[in-house]
């Protein structure tokens, strides 16, 4: 805008000089200026009108080179340069006014109407007020708005305020680089990579192994009845050789903590009628619904953990004995070969058998008794009922050898098998057995409540 205004002011000054000289008739001035329909048409550069006025041309150049000159000063200087408006023709004045209006103020809504016939002081006041009209900020000029910039495009002089504002805008647009680089722990990276090497078992492999294992359970008269998810979990633990095998108690605990009520109901059906009878005895005490489910959960967890340990041992023994048969029945013959070593399999099986021994029961026993203690402290019930529930937990743990027999159902002698069938009719080989005196104590509590 400043360049356009400077050009318009040069045209105004040129018109004034041409009018003041009054040496050329309008007919003779057609070589330089032709006035048609109030339009100014120049056939040559405006500097030709200043050719014979060296002093005024030098003064105008010095004024344009002034670094402290603003738009208001430029407008005031141009208006005062038109000393005598009466000597100029009407066409020249109208042409200069149109150029100033169109180029200095391109928007017609904010364009002021200048009258060059007014005295210089009044015209200067109008131009100075018009220069303060607010205009739309451009995207590139919004950062440095309010900064006084020189009218000359070749100037490189800046005030302290200008330099400070430019520095602030530069800091706001430049992205800060990180001075520190965070490095991961090498041990953590190795453990993460090692954990990611867990093999993904295709569904058709899980289904085939599950079918063969069910045939094995039917032939051995074992009633584990694993689900497809349990078979997949056992198979993943078997083929995983890049990490240390987790104890079955840890795997089962992480799996059991997300069980819902319907999952517990389905699981209780696989743990035998002995556990169901014990839980039904608890239900006969008319405990609050929330307390009854909280009391059932530790018993179901312990019984299902016993089932898992026995089932894991049997499953790994089955895979070790039938690995060739399983591999040949699969499209991918090399699924069980190469990566899983016999040393890892033996270590995993030894870990499972170690968990089944009596010396590893202390931690599990403490957990079930602590869970019962937390539940009893949470609910307000009679002390006699609390004592009966604690006694049920102690008797439950003392008969751990009956809950997890080391001898499989198929390996028992006919005499022991007949005795077991007479003692526990309709029970699975890993069911729970609640002694008779304990049931009598619950009957005593129930009779006292009805009395």
From Swiss-Prot:
Glycosylation site residues:
66
Question: Per the record, which residues fall in region Disordered?
Answer: 175-194, 404-451
Q: Where is the composition biased (Polar residues)?
A: 175-184, 413-426
Q: Which cysteines are joined by disulfide bonds?
A: none
Motif RxLR-dEER location, chain numbering? 48-69
Which intervals carry biased composition (Basic and acidic residues)? Answer: 437-451
Note the superkingdom of the native organism.
Eukaryota
| Transcription regulation as UniProt keyword | no
Keywords of the record, alphabetical order, are: Glycoprotein, Host nucleus, Secreted, Signal, Virulence
Gene Ontology cellular component list? extracellular region; host cell nucleus
Where does it live in the cell?
Secreted; Host nucleus
- Signal peptide start-end: 1-19
Please verify whether the record's keywords include Nuclease.
no
Family, per entry? Belongs to the RxLR effector family.
Q: What is known of its domains?
A: The RxLR-dEER motif acts to carry the protein into the host cell cytoplasm through binding to cell surface phosphatidylinositol-3-phosphate.
Please give the function described in this protein's UniProt entry.
Secreted effector that acts as an elicitor that induces cell death in host plant cells.
Protein's UniProt name: Secreted RxLR effector protein 111
